Regions:
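Single-pass alpha-helical membrane anchors
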Residues: 166-192
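Short acidic DE-rich linear segments
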Residues: 1-2, 190-194
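Catalytic glycan-binding domains that act on GlcNAc-containing polysaccharides
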Residues: 1-141, 148, 152
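Prokaryotic Sec-type signal peptides and long signal-anchor helices
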Residues: 18, 63, 155, 172-175, ...
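Short, aromatic-rich amphipathic segments at membrane interfaces
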Residues: 153-167
């Protein structure tokens, strides 16, 4: 599993629970580990003073309240206990998160889930420029707005910088994860062995 070597406490229990909640959500554990590593370095006590985001997936204060807790309480939880709230956060989106991009969009800007690459991240009360100014590393085009496509490119750049370029994509088909690269390898090997 990606980044499992970065888990510093309760490692076996944490990884087992990650696998369990991912199975319930129908997502790849690597995807969730990527998001948690990117957002918090897998630190359940991580805190961003700009806005008060806290925890493994950087819960915002209003989000934590909606989940029946507070960011302060989340920061005091163990990594294993906090996974209950990670699961609770993603649960309404189960069946709709079919890629790492989808999972990360739900984490960062849930309204963008399922939108085309041209969709601009903004709301009637939160202008695109405010979102871009708060996240300059994601505004790759430096045009004071972030599109879904730009967000996906940012994820790809993060993956590449972390050495996670695998040369094949993971597709979700009928609830099963099939690695296209492995299938291609098998077909090529079989054909060459004949």
């Amino acid at each position: 599993m990606w980044f499992e070597n970065k888990v510093t406490s309760n490692k076996e229990a944490f990884l087992q629970k990650v696998r369990l909640i991912c199975a319930k959500l129908g997502i790849e554990p690597d995807w969730l580990m990527f998001v948690m590593n990117s957002e918090s370095g897998l630190n359940p006590a991580a805190y961003n003073p700009n806005g008060g985001a806290s925890g493994l997936i950087q819960f915002m204060p209003d989000t934590a309240k909606g989940l029946g807790t507070t960011t302060e309480a989340l920061r005091k939880m163990s990594n294993v206990a906090q996974l209950d709230y990670v699961y609770k956060y993603f649960y309404p989106y189960r069946g709709k998160m079919n890629s790492l991009y989808d999972l990360y969009l739900v984490t960062f800007f849930p309204a963008a889930l399922g939108k085309p690459d041209s969709y601009v991240l903004q709301t009637s009360t939160l202008p695109a420029k405010v979102i871009a100014d708060a996240n300059p590393g994601i505004d790759l085009d430096h045009d004071d707005r972030i599109t879904v496509g730009e967000f996906k490119r940012w994820i790809d750049l993060k993956k590449k910088s972390m050495g996670l370029e695998t040369g094949f994509d993971v597709f979700v088909i009928a609830g099963s994860f099939i690695c296209a690269g492995i299938i291609l390898w098998y077909i090529l090997k079989r054909d060459n062995d004949d």
